[in-house]
Amino acid sequence: MTDTATAPVASDSVAGVGRIVRVTGPVVDIEFPHDSIPPVYNALKTTITIGEESTEITLEIALHLGDDVVRAIALKPTDGLVRGQEVRDTGAAISVPVGDITKGKVFNVTGDILNNEGGEPIEITERWPIHRKPPMFDQLESKTQLFETGIKVIDLLTPYVQGGKIGLFGGAGVGKTVLIQEMIQRVAQDHGGVSVFAGVGERTREGNDLIMEMEEAGVFDKTALVFGQMDEPPGTRLRVALSALTMAEYFRDVKNQDVLLFIDNIFRFTQAGSEVSTLLGRMPSAVGYQPNLADEMGVLQERITSTRGHSITSLQAIYVPADDYTDPAPATTFAHLDATTELSREIASRGLYPAVDPLTSTSRILDPRYLGQAHYDTATRVKAILQKNKELQEIIAILGVDELSEEDKVTVSRARRIQQFLSQNTYMAKKFTGVEGSTVPLKNTIESFSKIADGDYDHVAEQAFFNVGDLDDVERRWSEIQKENG
């Protein structure tokens, strides 16, 4: 662990005991002796006893109010706390377990293991504090490198950056969970890396479904999961992304592995920050959000990066309130993103998966300086054909295909083949389709789409392009179709 990466942690020698002077929901004011006031971000502990049941709760110091009183945010419900009750300073910030021990485990914000009920006690050898400095400038990887996924539509049209941040938009039922699992599988299989999942404000049911689906798919043991559920206090939902990120940083910095960090949902991180800000009595800014929204987002996002050749690549699900992209919460997130992947319900309804919308998805490295001229030219031509086809759909709906010019008919025909070819048999979808997944090298993807755009495959039926890997699969499927048709 490098000293540049670790936030300062208070010494045990100054740890003291304070007493609660006020409780307002999840906000607790505590008075400490004058000579042992703990610093901001220190974790405090106290015990709530109701009947015969005792529960230890953790609080995090957010403000110093003066007169030896600190204001803390509770990370568990405060029902049962009373004035005068003792609170113990732990002498350090919240810390979480790190290392291989985290794989195949489900954690809460403070690093307690949630899926070891009745099992053998697990010995945790190392913990890292969740408040850490981003890597120093001279530690950053200066190269902008493509993160190759082997998924054609992503690699060609919305390429991901190694160590970048990708925004993932998608409603229910469009294949978002399958895409998450697919990326986890591919990081483990093709990049020798691990995945960390942060459930920020997750519905408990959704989190449970995700765990069961990951176990079925065989990717659970390659993943660490950290949950701050929807029913938990805002302090928990605000910090859970930092807990997950800390685990990811260990794999990057100590294990020298590439990591995929999935955050669902980054909007709920902002929402939790807004709730905490209001509870602390800060004056709200635009649309009621916290005044330090940009700073809070920056603290999280600046730690997601590449260092010394190893990276944390982050896939962040983003909820857009009322589809208003100018809302401060999504607008602040967009400033940090390197690529956006939008999953389309209309494309999913046609059975084309991954249901990525090639025209609304974007990437900052879709540029010949980063990808090379051949990749850029092919991607631009494919997008132009799809855009022209979209414009012609209105004419087709009113007048029919026959009324189009010969040139437009060719464009529509090629666009349909491209749309079919953008679909792909994925490893995670095998249980639905019965078709083995495929990883398509980027070079093959560029050559394949270039040939389709040139018209080299105009003679091949559209159905031969559906849910296949490369052009070899298309030719094989086309031969089978021809045999069936005699």
Curated annotation (Swiss-Prot):
The keyword Acyltransferase does not apply. It catalyses: ATP + H2O + 4 H(+)(in) = ADP + phosphate + 5 H(+)(out). It is found in: Cell membrane. It is an enzyme of class 7 (translocase). Its main location: membrane. It comes from the Bacteria. ATP binds at G170, G171, A172, G173, V174, G175, K176, T177. Gene3D superfamilies: 2.40.10.170, Bovine Mitochondrial F1-atpase, Atp Synthase Beta Chain, Chain D, domain 3, P-loop containing nucleotide triphosphate hydrolases. Produces ATP from ADP in the presence of a proton gradient across the membrane. The catalytic sites are hosted primarily by the beta subunits. F-type ATPases have 2 components, CF(1) - the catalytic core - and CF(0) - the membrane proton channel. CF(1) has five subunits: alpha(3), beta(3), gamma(1), delta(1), epsilon(1). CF(0) has three main subunits: a(1), b(2) and c(9-12). The alpha and beta chains form an alternating ring which encloses part of the gamma chain. CF(1) is attached to CF(0) by a central stalk formed by the gamma and epsilon chains, while a peripheral stalk is formed by the delta and b chains. Belongs to the ATPase alpha/beta chains family. PANTHER family: ATP SYNTHASE (PTHR15184), ATP SYNTHASE SUBUNIT BETA, MITOCHONDRIAL (PTHR15184:SF71). This is ATP synthase subunit beta. It comes from Clavibacter michiganensis subsp. michiganensis (strain NCPPB 382).
